């Protein structure tokens, strides 16, 4: 039932205009206001809108049966409804590309270009939370399977097949290229899965920074601060666009892991945001906290 309710149209604003007519509708509004007043915002970076709607379906059942479902505002919210009436195949006409705005490349004057090939610890520690960086040069990749193998090799005292000292690693498993592509879609994966590896990898390899998606947990943040490293956030949900910044790609280690092998990317102006700086300041903590105070002070929720 919880999942079924998420297929209903977004209509919370209509409900707010006409007012609730039942306890369930009252509860929808209460939860909607309470969650948005937290100031969590899009991608957890702070803002007025955290949820777009709250759905509630009730049915006589045991008191312990309280299913809750959440749907992210991504591809999962796009649905097509059609009827199979036996007259033939149900063909879906692709919308015209003209319905979308043109993609523009304007990062603004405040973005800082970073040369990964000459990166120093001092430069890493100068990055500020929320700052936009444009990465250029050689970047390595590695996600779950690669990290597990790296840590296992370190624990056995073995030499890694690739030198991570002074490098930046991107949490990604790129899709295989097609036609004239250098690499397929290469969007960041959720970074918290690498949290348990972070301290050991930073300490024993000399890695400078990591690039991934979403927030880092307390263990990773403490490790980043301890080792004066940084965590950079790439744009989630834009894997194809991120791949346009990758100018060359080759596998350099753990080829048997397929897409989770360690790749060497050469990137050009790859946009990222400083999400955790060398002092352990996380924008996923400061952003929501700042917006929660704004909402409380100005009653703008």
Give the label of every model feature segment:
Residues 1-107, 203:
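Non-transmembrane, aqueous-exposed alpha-helical and coiled segments at domain scale
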Residues 5-46, 141-273:
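Feature captures the catalytic cores and cofactor-binding loops of soluble hydro-lyases/lyases
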Residues 40, 46-54, 61-64, 75, ...:
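C-terminal binding/interaction regions
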Residues 69-73, 86-88, 129, 149-152, ...:
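Short, solvent-exposed amphipathic alpha-helical segments in soluble enzyme
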Residues 109-119:
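Short, structured beta-strand/loop micro-motifs enriched in basic residues and often containing a Trp
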Residues 122-125, 162:
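Residue "hotspots" at secondary-structure boundaries inside conserved domains
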Residues 124-127, 133:
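Short, well-ordered loop/turn sites that connect or cap secondary structure elements
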Residues 132, 138-142, 278:
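Short, charged beta-turn/beta-strand-edge "cap" motif at the junction between a beta-strand
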């Amino acid at each position: 039932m919880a999942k079924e309710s998420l297929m209903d149209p977004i209509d919370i604003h209509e409900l707010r205009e006409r007012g609730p007519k039942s306890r369930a509708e009252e509860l929808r509004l209460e939860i909607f206001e309470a969650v948005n007043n937290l100031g969590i915002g899009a991608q957890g970076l702070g803002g007025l809108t955290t949820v777009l709607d709250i759905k509630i379906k009730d049915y006589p059942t045991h008191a312990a049966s309280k299913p809750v479902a959440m749907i992210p505002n991504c591809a999962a919210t796009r649905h097509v409804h059609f009827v199979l009436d036996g007259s033939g195949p149900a063909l879906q006409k692709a919308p015209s590309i003209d319905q979308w705005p043109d993609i523009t490349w304007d990062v603004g004057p405040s973005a800082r270009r970073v040369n990964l090939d000459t990166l120093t610890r001092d430069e890493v520690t100068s990055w500020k939370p929320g700052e936009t960086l444009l990465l250029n040069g050689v970047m390595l990749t590695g996600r779950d399977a690669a990290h597990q193998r790296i840590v296992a090799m370190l624990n056995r005292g073995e030499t890694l097949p690739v030198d991570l000292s002074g490098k930046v690693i991107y949490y990604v498993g790129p899709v295989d290229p097609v036609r004239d592509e250098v690499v397929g879609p290469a969007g960041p994966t959720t970074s918290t899965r690498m949290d348990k590896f972070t301290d050991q990898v930073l300490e024993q390899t000399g890695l400078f920074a990591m690039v991934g998606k979403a927030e880092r947990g307390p263990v990773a943040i403490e490790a980043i601060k301890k080792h004066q490293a940084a965590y950079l956030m790439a744009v989630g949900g834009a894997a194809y666009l991120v791949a346009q910044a990758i100018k060359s790609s080759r596998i350099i280690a753990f080829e048997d892991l397929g897409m989770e092998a360690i790749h060497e990317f050469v990137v050009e102006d790859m946009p990222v945001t400083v999400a955790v700086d060398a002092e352990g300041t996380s924008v996923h903590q400061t952003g929501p906290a700042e917006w929660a105070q704004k909402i409380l002070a100005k009653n703008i929720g």
